[in-house]
């Protein structure tokens, strides 16, 4: 990684504006999963231990530039304080006189959490005035919010124009793991691409076909490829306007010598419900009024064998409608295969894949779970992430 990190700068006595990703799931004002808060702890602890005055900023949800009471960060400040075992002060604004006064009161090793930065319309517009106001609070900017690195917002990109800007440890790990996967992978290198829509994964499939040895396709997007092979897909998800593209991807795989794996059998249902009637059918025998909602047992075995023989696997997107237990077997089989394959380095690309390994209790068996769904997707598309570009080079 060629970006400076907090190790490369002296933080003692400095006011450090640290952008974190505390966008945690909430229900009735309570945090239901604190993974993202825990993920930022190494950076926050390092700053505390090295005598920084720590100013934390994050978004929560999508308030669209207005104050939304249930999206305030009070519950986050409380949970962070419990995890750090020290008080975390919190302001009701993210800029302004109240915030300046709170920053002035900070001693070395103190932690202050600003209010939800997306309460300000200027945040998502990357308004230079808001970015300047953030910058005026601090001497140094640290970005540890990989999950928001694909956004050019005031607190992720704009602020870096006005302060020295470096990466935190979480950002560093994400860039190192994903960067190595794309630039210098251990082989055989396998990508597993699932999820509902081809259109969301076009860039990823296109970029990965240049790099992988094996490409495994699953989830709703697989049926556009199945249709491209000339098979009927019944009422399964289908993007008619992407059939030609699917054909071209299969052609490209052949040209590049990439082994392209698709489902050989599927679990079909007569309606979209957990208690629907289901059966397993070969891929070329999906009944007209049924939908394929998961990969079948033969496909699970096939994919498991490919995983077992891989040195590196990047997984982005589930194999079926894993939220319904009846159609979770395919996704679970992938997670289990990765957990069991000890010689295989597993990178889970955030979003639904991360939620799936959590659901099956296998998160601790994965080598790297990305904290950014959209960010890891754009990184794997080969795009430059604005929040990363803005950081200082070593």
Swiss-Prot record:
It catalyses: (2R)-3-phosphoglycerate + ATP = (2R)-3-phospho-glyceroyl phosphate + ADP. It comes from the Bacteria. Its EC number is 2.7.2.3. CDD domains: Phosphoglycerate_kinase. GO terms for molecular function: ADP binding; ATP binding; phosphoglycerate kinase activity. Pfam families: PGK. Substrate binds at residues 21-23, 36, 59-62, 118, 151. Signal peptide: none annotated. Pathway: Carbohydrate degradation; glycolysis; pyruvate from D-glyceraldehyde 3-phosphate: step 2/5. Its main location: cytoplasm. The modification Phosphothreonine is found at residue 299. One of its GO terms (biological process) is gluconeogenesis. InterPro entries: Phosphoglycerate_kinase, Phosphoglycerate_kinase_CS, Phosphoglycerate_kinase_N, Phosphoglycerate_kinase_sf. Keywords: ATP-binding, Cytoplasm, Glycolysis, Kinase, Nucleotide-binding, Phosphoprotein, Transferase. It is found in: Cytoplasm. ATP binds at residues 201, 316, 323, 350-353. One of its GO terms (cellular component) is cytosol. The keyword ATP-binding applies. Belongs to the phosphoglycerate kinase family. Monomer. This is Phosphoglycerate kinase.
């Amino acid at each position: 990684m060629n970006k400076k990190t907090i190790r490369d700068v002296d933080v003692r006595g400095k006011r450090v504006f640290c952008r974190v990703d505390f966008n945690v799931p909430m229900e009735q004002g309570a945090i239901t999963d604190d993974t993202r808060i825990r993920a930022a702890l190494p950076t926050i602890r390092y700053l505390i231990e090295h005598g920084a005055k720590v100013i934390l900023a994050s978004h929560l949800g999508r308030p669209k530039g207005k104050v939304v009471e249930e999206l305030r960060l009070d519950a986050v400040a409380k949970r962070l304080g419990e995890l750090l075992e020290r008080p975390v002060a919190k302001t009701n604004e993210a800029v302004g006189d109240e915030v300046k006064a709170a920053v002035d009161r900070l001693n070395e090793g103190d932690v202050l959490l600003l209010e939800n930065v997306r309460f300000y319309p200027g945040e998502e517009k990357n308004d230079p005035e808001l970015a300047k106001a953030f910058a005026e609070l601090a001497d140094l900017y640290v970005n540890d919010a990989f999950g928001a690195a694909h956004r050019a917002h005031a607190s992720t990109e704009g602020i870096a124009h006005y302060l020295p800007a470096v990466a935190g440890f979480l950002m560093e790990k994400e860039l190192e793991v994903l960067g190595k996967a794309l630039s210098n992978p251990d082989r055989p290198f396998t990508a597993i691409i699932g999820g509902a829509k081809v259109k969301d994964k076009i860039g990823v499939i296109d970029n990965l076909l240049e790099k992988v040895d094996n490409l495994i396709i699953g989830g709703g997007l697989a049926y556009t490829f199945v249709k491209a092979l000339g098979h009927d897909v019944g009422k399964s998800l289908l993007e008619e306007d992407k059939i030609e593209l699917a054909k071209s991807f299969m052609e490209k795989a052949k040209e590049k010598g990439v082994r392209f794996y698709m489902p050989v059998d599927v679990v079909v249902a007569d309606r979209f419900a957990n208690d629907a009637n289901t059966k397993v059918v070969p891929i070329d025998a999906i009944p007209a009024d049924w939908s394929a909602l998961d990969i079948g047992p033969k496909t699970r075995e096939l994919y498991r064998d490919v995983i077992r023989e891989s040195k590196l696997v990047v997984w982005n997107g589930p194999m079926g409608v894993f939220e319904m237990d009846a159609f979770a077997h395919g996704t679970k089989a992938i997670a289990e295969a990765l957990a069991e394959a000890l010689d295989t380095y597993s990178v889970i690309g955030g979003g639904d894949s991360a939620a799936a390994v959590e659901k099956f209790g296998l998160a601790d068996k994965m080598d790297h779970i990305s904290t950014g769904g959209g960010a890891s997707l754009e990184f794997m598309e080969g795009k430059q992430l604005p929040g990363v570009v803005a950081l200082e080079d070593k």
